[in-house]
């Protein structure tokens, strides 16, 4: 019983490390592709437009990341409607 619990915890730890490194690799590839195809100046411009605002169900870390009338869901980190109208 103890061995299976330790084994399960070890597997989960390894999976989380693998996922984190895969995420970093994807971000690096995205940055390299932007630089190659758009040039450095255009890549910087593209990053600014990416940071403008996130639409409904877009990923976010704070309420400011989301567009108007949306807020960042505290548990799932995506933009949801805040219940207000224009």
Curated annotation (Swiss-Prot):
It is found in: Secreted. Disulfide bonds join 53-67, 60-72, 66-79. Residues 1-20 form the signal peptide. GO terms for cellular component: extracellular region. It comes from the Eukaryota. Expressed by the venom gland. Pfam families: Toxin_12 (PF07740). Keywords: Amidation, Disulfide bond, Ion channel impairing toxin, Knottin, Secreted, Signal, Toxin. The modification Phenylalanine amide is found at residue 85. SUPFAM superfamilies: omega toxin-like. Its main location: secreted. Residues 21-51 form a propeptide. GO terms for molecular function: ion channel inhibitor activity; toxin activity. Belongs to the neurotoxin 10 (Hwtx-1) family. 42 (Jztx-44) subfamily. The presence of a 'disulfide through disulfide knot' structurally defines this protein as a knottin. Probable ion channel inhibitor. This is U22-theraphotoxin-Cg1a. It comes from Chilobrachys guangxiensis (Chinese earth tiger tarantula).
């Amino acid at each position: 019983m103890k061995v299976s619990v330790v084994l399960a915890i070890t597997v989960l730890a390894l999976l989380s490390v693998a996922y984190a490194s895969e995420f970093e690799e994807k971000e690096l590839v995205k940055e390299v592709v932007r630089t190659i195809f758009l040039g450095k100046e255009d890549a910087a411009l593209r990053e600014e437009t990416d940071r403008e605002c996130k639409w409904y169900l877009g990923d976010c870390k704070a309420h400011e990341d989301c567009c108007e009338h949306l807020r960042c869901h505290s548990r799932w980190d995506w933009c949801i409607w805040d219940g207000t109208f224009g």
